[in-house]
Swiss-Prot record:
Keywords in alphabetical order: ATP-binding, Kinase, Lipid A biosynthesis, Lipid biosynthesis, Lipid metabolism, Nucleotide-binding, Transferase
GO BP: lipid A biosynthetic process; lipopolysaccharide core region biosynthetic process
Pathway the protein acts in: Glycolipid biosynthesis; lipid IV(A) biosynthesis; lipid IV(A) from (3R)-3-hydroxytetradecanoyl-[acyl-carrier-protein] and UDP-N-acetyl-alpha-D-glucosamine: step 6/6
Function: Transfers the gamma-phosphate of ATP to the 4'-position of a tetraacyldisaccharide 1-phosphate intermediate (termed DS-1-P) to form tetraacyldisaccharide 1,4'-bis-phosphate (lipid IVA).
Reaction catalysed by this enzyme: a lipid A disaccharide + ATP = a lipid IVA + ADP + H(+)
InterPro entries reported for this sequence: LpxK, P-loop_NTPase
Residues reported in the UniProt entry to bind ATP: 58-65
HAMAP family on file: LpxK
Protein name per its UniProtKB record: Tetraacyldisaccharide 4'-kinase
Length: 332
């Protein structure tokens, strides 16, 4: 299914023209809904602390989670106490739920589990982001709210908007759902504070982000990084992210011999039997996001690659300046 959609959205499949009338309808609905909030006919919830939205205008993963982790570390370094809210995709959550390092992905979603495991950040997940934000402020000592996704959740007022764009795929065929990958028109990118480009090449006015591999970690936590597979070794690779080929290309660039690769749909659930059969006796390499979903049954030779986002110093300075301005405005 995912490969067919990729052909439609990114490879110029002619079927996109048949779906164009539905895209026009989708565009009209989303525009009308946005205008209801813009003119005040539908209320927006505001909060006494800055709200930063990390989202995108395309369907699928683009690098939001590494960006959220980058923001957490940047803001903490400068004395802020951020917290994160998220939808918790792929799991059914009644109301809202605080996320702790002991939670697994089946309880809170894969991205929240990964973010909290890496940073131990205060975090609340739930379908209603307003309720999640309120519980975050009620239960934790937080002075900035970061929303992992939620760019189109206009009921939540925001102070800073960041769009993460896949630098290789960019806007695909430029069409809205279902003919293309866009949730909103490309014009939306011009209305946000920053467009962050993951990979590829940033265009004028965009911020270039690089995902830098750091260290191999044992998925089950029982093995030392010193025993991780070495380059030139035969391995099996898997990825259930928005753009799996990016991970496979990274491994090839690092020198690993990919005996087999398996792309799964984003937010896929994994079973021990499926992954054991996939790997056989070879080391199984995966992303950090995949690892949080199989650490309970992982074998000793399963590894995940941690990556750190790198952004220009100028972006850091601009963001911190804007955060300071918002804090001062809210204190008046």
């Amino acid at each position: 299914m995912q490969s067919w959609v990729n052909k439609l959205w990114y490879d110029g499949h002619v079927l996109r023209f048949a779906l164009w009338p539905l895209s026009l309808l989708f565009a009209a609905i989303t525009w009308f809904r946005r205008q209801l909030y813009a003119v005040g006919l539908k209320p927006q919830a505001t909060f006494p602390v800055p709200v930063i939205i990390v989202g995108n205008i395309t369907v699928g993963g683009s690098g939001k989670t590494p960006t959220v982790i980058y923001l957490i570390e940047l803001l903490r370094k400068h004395g802020y106490k951020p917290g994160v809210i998220s939808r918790g995709y792929g799991v059914q959550i009644d109301g809202v739920r605080s996320v702790y390092p002991s939670n697994n992905a089946n309880q809170v979603g894969d991205e929240p589990a990964m973010i909290v495991a890496r940073t131990n950040i205060p975090m609340v997940v739930g379908a209603k982001r307003i309720d999640a934000a309120q519980q975050l402020l009620n239960d934790f000592d937080v002075d900035i709210i970061i929303s992992d996704d939620g760019l189109q959740h206009y009921a939540l007022a925001r102070d800073i908007e960041l769009i993460i764009l896949d630098g290789e795929r960019r806007l695909g065929n430029g069409m809205l759902l279902p003919a293309g990958p866009l949730r909103e028109g490309g014009w939306r990118a011009a209305a946000v504070d920053h467009v962050i480009v993951n990979g590829g090449e940033a265009q004028s006015g965009e911020q270039q982000m690089l995902l830098q591999p750091t260290l191999w970690h044992s998925v089950n936590g029982k093995q030392s990084p010193d025993t991780a597979p070495e380059p030139e070794q035969d391995v099996v690779a898997m990825a259930g992210i928005g753009n799996p080929s990016r991970f496979f290309d990274t491994l090839a660039d690092m020198g690993y011999r990919l005996d087999k690769v398996q792309a799964f749909d984003d937010h896929s659930a994994y079973s021990e039997a499926t992954l054991t059969a996939l790997a056989g006796e070879l080391p199984l390499l995966m992303t950090e996001k995949d690892a949080v979903k199989c650490r309970e049954f992982a074998k000793d030779n399963w590894w995940y690659l941690a990556v750190d986002a790198k952004l220009p110093h100028s972006f850091d300075q601009q963001l911190l300046t804007r955060v300071k301005q918002v804090v001062e405005e809210k204190q008046r």
